[in-house]
Amino acid sequence: MSVFDLFRGFFGFPGPRSHRDPFFGGMTRDDDDDEDDEEEEDSGAWGRESYAFDGFHPTEEFGFSFSPRGGMRFHGNFGFDDLVRDFNSIFSEMGAWTLPSHSPELPGPESETPGVRLREGQTLRDSMLKYPDSHQPRIFEGVLESHAKPESSKPAPDWGSQGPFHRLDDTWPVSPHSRAREDKDLDSQVSQEGLGPLLQPQPKSYFKSISVTKITKPDGTVEEHRTVVDSEGRRETTVTHQEAHDSSRSDPDPPRSSALDDPFSILDLLLGRWFRSR
């Protein structure tokens, strides 16, 4: 079976009148097809008059032409006329071959919905983010939303108490202010109360720095300075004095007699005994 037979069977066209493949040419021909072609040429199964259509020559196997109505027609005996006719009908219904009768117009300023338009002097923050998830009504064009939609004035259910983690509220209690999802005016609150109530207390680390300095004076007195600085910046200095130790412990050399310092005293010690003995 040739590729052309598969293509024709896929689209449901009738079977061929010969074993020759005029559409794909020699791509699917083999030796058996060549022998069949020679036999058919001898028997004259393909008449010369079958090719003469719309001025086509007998040697031509495939062709197409354009009709005045704008359609395209294939010439040949393989059922392409029905295929092209079906495609023309499909695209004509879809409007793919026809241009729009009028050009598209750009929307003008009058196409805007007057209900969504902001009031004069009203900011986008006040209209969109003032009460995002609360049950309080919004204000559009000076009219409350509850007046326009009475059924929307129902209070919103408290989904926080029914959530999957509502049992953890006892462990980590949540204040009512944290549950309220509203866009608060922080500028006026800061100007009135300051940043203290708004900022959450942060945990602080405590540390202490201790420095000790000892000074030994010439008389042997030891002076000790103990300075303690805590995390708050407070400084406390304590000074202690320690008296000198015993002279026998502090001075390793024994005291010398004052007589040894005088040379006459030394001579008196050495020669005095000799003269006194005489």
UniProtKB/Swiss-Prot annotation:
The modification Phosphoserine is found at residues 188, 191. Residues 183-278 are annotated as: Involved in PKD2 binding. It is found in: Mitochondrion matrix; Endoplasmic reticulum; Nucleus membrane; Cytoplasmic vesicle. Residues 15-50, 99-262 are annotated as: Disordered. Residues 174-205 are annotated as: Involved in CASP9 binding. Residues 209-278 are annotated as: Mediates interaction with UCP3. The keyword rRNA-binding does not apply. The record marks 126-127 as: Cleavage. This is HCLS1-associated protein X-1. Present in striated muscles (at protein level). Residues 175-246 are annotated as: Involved in GNA13 binding. The modification N-acetylserine is found at residue 2. One of its GO terms (biological process) is regulation of actin filament polymerization. One of its GO terms (cellular component) is cytoplasm. Residues 30-43 have a biased composition (Acidic residues). Recruits the Arp2/3 complex to the cell cortex and regulates reorganization of the cortical actin cytoskeleton via its interaction with KCNC3 and the Arp2/3 complex. Slows down the rate of inactivation of KCNC3 channels. Promotes GNA13-mediated cell migration. Involved in the clathrin-mediated endocytosis pathway. May be involved in internalization of ABC transporters such as ABCB11. May inhibit CASP9 and CASP3. Promotes cell survival. May regulate intracellular calcium pools. Residues 132-152, 216-254 have a biased composition (Basic and acidic residues).
